[in-house]
Every structure is written in structure tokens, then in C-alpha cells.
Amino acid sequence: MLIKRFKMKLGTKILCLVFVVILLFSASVGTVMLKEITESMKQMATEKAKGDLALSSTYIDDVMSGDWQVKNNKLYKGQTQINGNEDIVDLLGEKTGDTITIFQGDTRVATNVMKNGERAVGTQASSEVIAAVLKKGKRFYGQADVAGSSYQTAYMPLKDQNGNIIGMLYTGANQSILASLTQSLFTQFAIVLVIVIMVSVILVLVFTRKINKRLNALKSAFESAGNGDMTIEVSDKTGDELSELSVYYNKMRMKLNDTIQTVQQSALQLASASQQLSAGAEETNQASEKITEAVQQIANGAQDQITRIENSESSLKQASADIRDISANTAAIADKGQLAQSKADIGQKEIANVQAQMDAIHQSIQKSGEIIHQLDGRSKQIEQILSVITQIADQTNLLALNAAIEAARAGEQGKGFAVVADEVRKLAEESQQSAGQISKLIIEIQKDMNRSARSVEHVKTEAAEGVTMIQRTRDAFKEIAAATGEISAEISDLSASVTNISASAHQINDSFAANTADIKESTKNTRQAAALTEEQFAAMEEITAASETLSQLAEELTGIISQFKMINQAENG
């Protein structure tokens, strides 16, 4: 109860924490600052006392000429008596704002320090000051007790003309001034502290309000998720830890949503499978009953089968003998088929040789035709040459005639030339006659070559037809050889098959005997199977009961999962 009563929210905790931290920090800073300020003020007061001491000493030297001296047990400055001289100390006190005292030895003889409402004349300085100033001849600066009050003081020794210390000059600032100044600073610090605390509280409130808003969004999302609603998504893009927490929540939400949907689908599948299992078990029970009846029928029919097998065994032996005869006949047919295939192969080779010879004859005829064609061309060339020779002979005869005429004109000088021209004419005439005879022979040769060309063409046609017929004959022999080979192969396969059938028949005959024993054993096993089937029927009844229980569990799981609101359901809604 106490824990619940003092339970605070996160914003209140942060506010209290910030408040405590500010207070501790302010207290620490205030303490250090107060100490530093106090020390600084004391230092400033001491420095002021130093300056005022020098000012007072200089002022006294200015207004009072002469050395310090003691006459008639009185302290003098020059000719001015210091004992009871209140004017000088009051004047210096007004100028400096300090307390001023002039000592004769260690005793105050002139001072503006008040004690119990009177000037503290006749009182002594503190032992610390006496030891430092009067005995050691040094100046003293610092805090000292003055007539029962604490001051920041400055002391200097007063010496006569011989250098003997005969007294002291003192200036001091009262600590009450420091106390009031310190109190004023502390008051200002407290005011600033209160302002800082108020501003901090406001900033913390604004900050915690924003955080509370973001935390409330997360809280609402987690609360909805706890109640089964997975549709709420938290969007926080500030980039801090709460933003990361939002991202992790969204990832968790999606993962949990997928997991629950998977479980839901699995539960539905489980329910469906359990129903199918129950239905299958029921069908199996029915099938088991039918199997029991069938097994019993099989057992009853096994004996009848044994009787039929024994009757078939004698028939199988006769079939085996017939198969052996078929195997022998098939082997003889296979030998004849191989012989026919051998003859077909020989005929195919002979046809191939004849075709090769016909191809050679056909090629020779083609070459003869080409040669005759070439001779016809050559005879035409010779005919052209003879024509040229005839033309040359005609021209030569004409030239010889002209030469004879010219020789006759020349008389005796042309007789020799006339003889030569006559011989040339004779040669030209003989050339013409020879060319005519050759032309006749060439015409006869051309006629013979034309007849030969026609004969060669006819022979070529006949040879081509012979090659075609031989090719057809060769193709026919190939088909005969192939068919004979196929028949031989089929006969060989048939022979092998018959041999295998014969062997199988022997095996079947042997197997019938073994099967008879196996069927007897099977009958025994069938009766045992009937008993096992009854046991299986009882087991299937147990499976049916278990599947019904599984179906109930699946329905309960589906009901539990239906309490969750999925993301896909919200989108479809």
C-alpha cells in the first residue's frame, strides 16, 4: 500500500531529480563562490588597509613635520603630541573609512576604535601583532582582533630618528562590512537560484510533457497489444531512444502479428486435418471390416486354388513338350533364313560389280562423244585453213600470170623470170587441186563424224538406261538382303523367345510345385491376418477418439487466436 501510495510518474521523477541536482549544484557552487568571495573581500580589505596605511602615514608626515619620538613618556610627531590627539585619527578615519590607531609601544594612545561606547585608548594590541611589528620590525597584514572585534588590518612600525621602534600605526576594515556585503551577494545568488529553479522546472515540465505524450502513445500501443489488438502502429521520428523503442515495438508487432496469423492458419489446418483424420479413421474401420471378410474369403478360396493348380500341372508338362518341338523347328527355319541372306548378299555384290562396269562404259562413251565433238571442231578449222590456202593459190596464180606478161614485155631479159613465173603458176594450180581434194575428204570425214556422234548419243542413252536398270536391280537386292536380314533376325529372336519360353515353362512347372506349398502357407497367414485386422480395427477406434480430442483442441486454439485483432483484418475491415 505504501509503495502504491508513493508511486510517482516518470515526469515527476525527472522533475524531482532535476530539482535535487540543481539544489546540490547550487549549494556546491554557492559554497565555493561564498568562500571565494569572502577570501576576495578579505584580500580587498587587506589591500585597502595597506593603501590606507600608506595614505595615513604620508598624511601624518605632511601635516606633522619632524621625527617620531617619546618625550616625558608621551609619543610625539615632531612637536605634536599624539597621546589623546583625537583629531588626527578622526580625520584619517573620515578620509579612508577605516579605523585608525596610533600606538606608543603596544598601547593605543590615539584611536577611533570604540569599545563599550568609548575610545579604546590604553588597550594593547594582540600578541601576534606585537611579535611581528614591535619585535621583528615588520609590517603586519591580515585579520586580527581589535578591541574584541575582528578586522582586516595593516600595521607598520614607528621608528625614531635612531631607528628604534617606539610605536605602531594601524588601519583596519571592520568585518561587519564584509558580512553585510556577503549577505547581499548571498541574497542575490538565492534570487538567481530561485529563478534558475523556476525556469528549469518549466523546461522540465515542457520536456516531460512531450516525453509523457510519446510514452503514452507507446503505453497505449502496448496496452492494445496486450488486449490482442495488433493494428496500432507507433510513429516516432525524433531519432532518440524512445524513437528506437517505437521502431522495435513496430517490428515486434509485425513479427507477433505474423506469428499469430501463422498459428491461426496452423490451427485451422490442424482442425481440418483432425476432421480428415477422424473421417479417414472411420473409413479405415469400415475398410478393416471389409478386409476381414475378404481375408476370410481368401482363406476359403485358397484350398480351391490349390486343387486347380494341381490339375494345371499336368497340362503344363504337355505344353512344355510342345514348346520344345516348336523350338527345334524354329532353329531349322533360322538356318534357312541365314542361307537366304548369304545368297542375297552375294547377288548384291555381283550387281555392284556390274554397275561399276556400266559406269565405266558410260564414262568411256561420254569421252568418245567429247572426242568426236573435238574432231568436228578441228575439221572445221582445217576447212577454214584450206579456204585460206585456196585463196592464196588463186592470188599466186594471178601473180604468176602478171609476172609472165611482164617477162614477155621484157624480152630476153625476162625469160628467166618467165620460167620462174610459170613454175609458180604450176605450183599454185597443184595447190588448188590438192586443197580441193582435201576439202572433199574433210566433207566425207565430217559426214562420218556426224554419223558416229549420233551413234555415240544413242549408245550413251542406252548405257544410261542400263545404269538406271542396274541401280534399280541393286536397290531391289538391297531391299531383299535387308528383308532377309530382318526375317533372319526375327527368326533368331523367335528362336530365342521359344527357347526362353521353354525354359520359363520348366520354371513355371517348378514354380507350380513351390506355389502349392506357398498357397498353403498363405492360407495359414491369411487366417493370422484376419486376427491382426481385428486388432487394427480396435486400434483405429482409439485413433478416432484421439482425432476427435485433437479437433476439440484445434477449435479451442482457434477461439483463443480469434481474440487477437490482426493487421490484415483491420485493413479488410
Curated annotation (Swiss-Prot):
Residue ranges of coiled coil: none
GO terms for MF: transmembrane signaling receptor activity
Residue numbers bearing the Glutamate methyl ester (Glu) modification: E535, E542
InterPro entries linked: Chemotax_Me-accpt_rcpt, HAMP_dom, MCPsignal_dom, sCache_3, Sensor-like_sf
Domain HAMP, chain residue ranges per copy: 209-261
GO cellular component, one term: plasma membrane
GO biological process, one term: signal transduction
Transmembrane segments: 14-34, 189-207
CDD domains documented for this protein: HAMP (cd06225), MCP_signal (cd11386)
Sites bearing Glutamate methyl ester (Gln), chain numbering: Q276
Compartments, as annotated in UniProt: Cell membrane
Similarity comment: Belongs to the methyl-accepting chemotaxis (MCP) protein family.
Name the UniProt record assigns to this protein: Methyl-accepting chemotaxis protein TlpC
Protein's organism: Bacillus subtilis (strain 168)
Organism classification: Bacteria, Bacillati, Bacillota, Bacilli, Bacillales
